[in-house]
From Swiss-Prot:
Pfam families: PK (PF00224), PK_C (PF02887). InterPro entries: Pyr_Knase, Pyrv/PenolPyrv_kinase-like_dom, Pyrv_kinase-like_dom_sf, Pyrv_Knase-like_insert_dom_sf, Pyrv_Knase_brl, Pyrv_Knase_C, Pyrv_Knase_C_sf, Pyrv_Knase_insert_dom_sf. It comes from Thermoplasma acidophilum (strain ATCC 25905 / DSM 1728 / JCM 9062 / NBRC 15155 / AMRC-C165). Its cofactor is Mg(2+); K(+). Keywords: ATP-binding, Glycolysis, Kinase, Magnesium, Metal-binding, Nucleotide-binding, Potassium, Pyruvate, Transferase. Substrate binds at R31, G227, D228, T260. K(+) binds at N33, D61. Mg(2+) binds at E204, D228. GO terms for molecular function: ATP binding; kinase activity; magnesium ion binding; potassium ion binding; pyruvate kinase activity. Homotetramer. This is Pyruvate kinase. Its EC number is 2.7.1.40. Belongs to the pyruvate kinase family.
Length: 544
C-alpha cells in the first residue's frame, strides 16, 4: 500500500490492542486532537505507539485561536430570517476587533455555517439574517474571504508544543492557516523550543486557499480540512479546491492529507457507503499522500474496520491506476533531475525498489512526488526523519544505525539485506542527493542487486556466475596485481586498475576493475558478477 493512513486517537482506539490492529492494517500516522485531549495524554500515547511500532509517526493537531460567539441568555438565541442584529449588543464575539476587517455586503456564517448573515452597516455594526436558525453558546463564526487576525497559537497550544517536543512527536498541525507568516511563526516557536518537527498547514479558510502557493513554501505538509473549508466555500467548489491544493502542494514537494468525513458512516456502521468509496478513490487518483480518519477512529464503533477499508480501497486503486508525475517542480533543479532520473530508471528496468539515501529527506520527497511504480525506501540514520518520511506516498522507512559520514556502500547494502524486504537478485535503484554517502559521490543514481554482497567495481561485459580462481582452474580469474596467466577465462576481477593494452586484449569478456571487496573471495567459490553494476555476489544455485 502506497497511500498512507492517518487516524485520530480517542476512546475507541486508545487501547494497545486496538492500536496494534490498526497499525497492522496499514496505519502510518496517529493524530492527537488537542481540542479533545489532555496534555498528559501526549506522553502516554507516544509511549504506547512507540512500543508497538517505532516507524509510526505521531501528530499533534493544535486547536489554535478560534472566533466564536459569546454566551446567550438561556444558552440559545433564535434567529429569524430578514431580521437585523446588532453586533456587540445582540450577538457578542470573543474578539470584536476582527469586525474592523469586515465590509458592508460581506457574509458572516455562524454555527458551522448553519446560520448566515449579511453585513448591512458598520456603524452601528448590523447584520441581517439570511435564514432561520438557532445559535448556541460559543457558536463557531466564519467570515469567508476576509483575513481575520486572530494570532497563530494560544498559550494552550504552546504547552502542547513543548510537551510534544519533550516526548518526540513528529508533526504539528496548524489550524486555520491564512498566510505563510502563520506557519513561519509556529516554526520559529518550535525551533526556539528545541524541536525540529514537520509543520502541517490545515487549509480550512478561503484566505488559506487564496494564499496556498505561499503557504506550501513555508510548510512541510498540507491538510485539506474539508469540514471548515466547506463552510467557507460553496459546497460545489470544495472538490475542485481539493484538487488545486493537492497539485500546488506537490509542485513544492509537500505531502498532502485529505481529511473530514472520509468514512463518516463507519462511526456507527461496519461498512462504508458507495459515495464514500468513490470519494476515497478520487482522492487517491488526485495524488493525495494520505487519508485521515477523525470520528471514525476516535469515537466510532469500528476503528479497525475503517482503517482496513482504506487499505483495501488503496491497494485496489493503486494496482489499477497509473499515477501522474508532478510535471513541474518548484525546487532545486539539479536534485529534481536526479530524482527524476531515479524514477525513470526504476520504471524502465522494473526495479524492486528505490533506495534513497538521505540526511534531510529532500531526495525522498522529490522522488515520491514523481510517483514511481516501485516503492521508495528512505534510508537514513535518523529514526525521527524515517518516521516523518513515512507519511509520503509510496515511501517506507529504512532506519540505519551509525554515522552517515562513515557508512560505506557495502555497509548500506548489508542494512538493506538485513531488513528482510528484498530477496536475493532483487534489483534496486539507489540514489543520494547528499555528499557524505560514499557509494559514488554526490547526486548519484546507480543500480544494485541484492544478494550476499562481496564487493563492487567498474564492470564491462555480461552478467554471469562461475567459480573463482587465483590460478588456472576456474571460470573467473582473481588478480590483485593486474597480471593474468592467460585470457581463457569467462571473466576477470581486478582489485586494481589495469593497463589499456590488457583491457583491449580482454574485449568480449566480463571484466571488473578497481574491485573493492568486503572479504576475500575463496578459491573455487561460486560468485556472481552483475555486468551492469559491477556488483559481486555469492552465486545462488539458479544463477548461470
Amino acid at each position: 500500500m502506497k497511500t498512507k493512513i492517518v487516524a485520530t486517537i480517542g476512546p475507541a482506539s486508545s487501547s494497545p490492542e486496538i492500536m496494534k490492529q490498526m497499525i497492522d492494517n496499514g496505519l502510518s500516522l496517529v493524530r492527537i486532537n488537542s481540542a479533545h485531549a489532555d496534555i498528559k495524554d501526549v506522553s502516554k500515547i507516544t509511549q504506547m505507539v512507540r512500543s508497538i511500532n517505532r516507524d509510526v509517526g505521531i501528530m499533534i493537531d493544535l486547536k489554535g485561536p478560534e472566533l466564536r460567539t459569546g454566551e446567550f441568555a438561556g444558552g440559545t438565541l433564535k434567529i429569524s430570517s430578514g431580521k437585523d442584529y446588532v453586533m456587540g449588543k445582540d450577538i457578542v464575539l470573543n474578539n470584536m476587533n476582527v469586525l474592523s476587517a469586515v465590509q458592508v455586503g460581506d457574509r458572516i456564517l455562524m454555527s458551522d455555517g448553519e446560520v448566515s448573515f449579511e453585513v448591512e452597516s458598520t456603524d452601528p455594526f448590523t447584520i441581517r439574517a439570511l435564514n432561520d436558525g438557532v445559535l448556541r453558546d460559543r457558536s463557531r463564526v466564519n467570515i469567508p474571504g476576509r483575513f481575520i487576525e486572530l494570532g497563530t497559537i494560544t498559550d494552550r497550544d504552546r504547552a502542547f508544543i513543548r510537551e510534544g517536543i519533550a516526548d518526540g512527536v513528529d508533526f504539528f498541525a496548524l489550524s486555520f492557516v491564512q498566510k505563510s507568516e502563520n506557519v513561519d511563526s509556529l516554526r520559529d516557536f518550535v525551533i526556539d523550543s528545541g524541536g525540529d518537527q514537520y509543520i502541517i498547514s490545515k487549509i480550512e479558510t478561503k484566505s488559506g486557499l487564496d494564499n496556498i502557493e505561499e503557504i506550501v513554501k513555508s510548510s512541510d505538509g498540507i491538510m485539506v480540512a474539508r469540514g471548515d473549508l466547506g463552510v467557507e466555500l460553496p459546497l460545489k467548489e470544495v472538490v475542485l479546491a481539493q484538487k488545486h491544493i493537492i497539485k500546488t502542494a506537490h509542485e513544492d514537494g509537500d505531502f498532502t492529507i485529505v481529511a473530514t468525513q472520509v468514512l463518516e458512516s463507519m462511526v456507527n456502521n461496519s461498512s462504508p457507503t458507495r459515495a464514500e468509496i468513490s470519494d476515497i478513490t478520487n482522492a487517491i487518483i488526485d495524488n493525495a499522500d494520505a487519508l485521515m480518519l477523525s470520528e471514525e477512529s476516535a469515537i466510532g464503533k469500528y476503528p479497525v474496520q475503517a482503517v482496513r477499508t482504506l487499505k483495501e480501497v488503496s491497494d485496489y486503486v493503486e494496482d489499477k491506476v497509473s499515477f501522474d508525475s508532478s510535471y513541474y517542480f518548484k525546487g532545486n533543479t539539479i536534485a529534481y533531475s536526479v530524482a527524476r532520473a531515479a524514477k525513470i530508471l526504476s520504471d524502465d528496468i522494473k526495479s524492486d525498489g528505490i533506495v534513497a539515501l538521505t540526511h534531510t529527506g529532500s531526495t525522498v520527497r522529490m522522488i515520491s512526488s514523481l510517483r514511481p511504480k516501485a516503492m521508495v525506501y528512505a534510508a537514513t540514520v535518523s529514526e525521527s526523519l524515517a518516521r516523518k518520511l513515512n507519511i509520503y506516498f509510496g515511501v517506507l522507512p529504512l532506519h540505519m544505525e551509525g554515522n552517515a559520514e562513515d557508512l560505506s556502500f557495502s555497509e548500506i547494502m548489508e542494512y538493506i539485506v538485513r531488513s528482510g524486504r528484498f530477496a536475493d537478485g532483487s534489483k534496486l535503484v539507489m540514489t543520494s542527493g547528499d555528499p557524505y554517502f560514499t557509494f559514488g559521490g554526490t547526486n548519484d543514481v546507480k543500480v544494485a542487486v541484492v544478494g550476499k554482497f562481496i564487493g563492487r567495481g567498474y564492470s564491462f561485459g555480461d552478467s554471469l556466475s562461475g567459480t573463482a580462481t587465483y590460478g588456472t582452474k576456474g571460470d573467473i580469474l582473481m588478480s590483485e596485481d593486474g597480471r593474468i596467466p592467460g585470457t581463457d577465462f569467462r571473466a576477470f576481477i581486478f582489485t586494481s586498475d589495469i593497463k589499456p593494452s590488457l583491457m583491449s586484449s580482454l574485449k568480449g569478456k566480463t571484466v571488473v576493475t578497481k574491485a573493492r571487496l568486503v572479504r576475500q573471495i575463496k578459491e573455487g567459490e561460486r560468485i556472481y558478477i552483475d555486468g551492469n553494476t559491477g556488483i559481486i555476489l555469492m552465486a545462488s544455485p539458479d544463477q548461470k
